Amino acid sequence: MKYDFDKITDRKGTDCLKYDFAKERGRHEGILPLWVADMDFPTLPQVSERLRKITEHGIYGYSDAKEPYFQALLGWYEKHFSWKIQKEWLIKTPGVVFALAAAVRAYTKPGEAVLLQQPVYYPFSEVIADNERVIVNSPLKLIDGHYEIDFDDFEQKIRDNNVKLFLLCSPHNPVGRVWKKWELEKIGEICIRYGVIVVSDEIHSDFTWGENKHCLLYTS
């Protein structure tokens, strides 16, 4: 189906965090809000219509994901990433940050080290610190306007700090890097060597363009 991506919808004054934040903080309202992953085009009409039917029912009780939900998810990953995942592998969470925090608590103990690569989506450091784990940063290198992984530093930080868990952002937010297969393989090799568990946030995996192709960490 065709979709009009050029339609402009004014979201100011609608309790929209993305646009109202500037006014609420006494800043110029013309500031471009590039700090949050919030789309500026309306939801698909089919989705809005389905939600409308649900709200018309008038009861907002507990619900559960049924088979069509799982089949859509499994089909998407097989079609776009050639990965045949199993329904039993899936765990529903309220959101990606909650999932990251749950992983930190499940796979590490207070006082243990968790690795990240800054600059990175700010909740990464929050879920580590808020759960009393130690933040270890292996910063990305900016080379000729292009961010790269410093693998020597990456391995040294893991070894010197006895890192237990690595939070990977793939594709990387905010630098926009779509990691290549060989980069993910090298990450995997190092982490396996030192027994480091990798938690990969791939929420932006569907948003690549041109010759960039997202590679799943699991299948690399």
Q: What residue spans do the PLM features occupy?
A:
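Conserved small/polar residues in nucleotide/adenosyl-binding loops
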Residues: 218-219
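Walker B catalytic acidic pair
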Residues: 202
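Hydrophobic "anchor" residues on beta-strands that sit immediately upstream
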Residues: 165, 197-198
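A structural signal for short, well-ordered beta-strand segments and their strand-loop junctions
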Residues: 33, 115-116, 199
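N-terminal small-domain helix-loop-helix segment of the aminotransferase-like
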Residues: 2-95
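Conserved core of the PLP fold type I
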Residues: 60-189, 206-214
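A short helix->loop->beta-strand "cap" motif at the edges of active sites that frequently abuts
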Residues: 133, 193-196
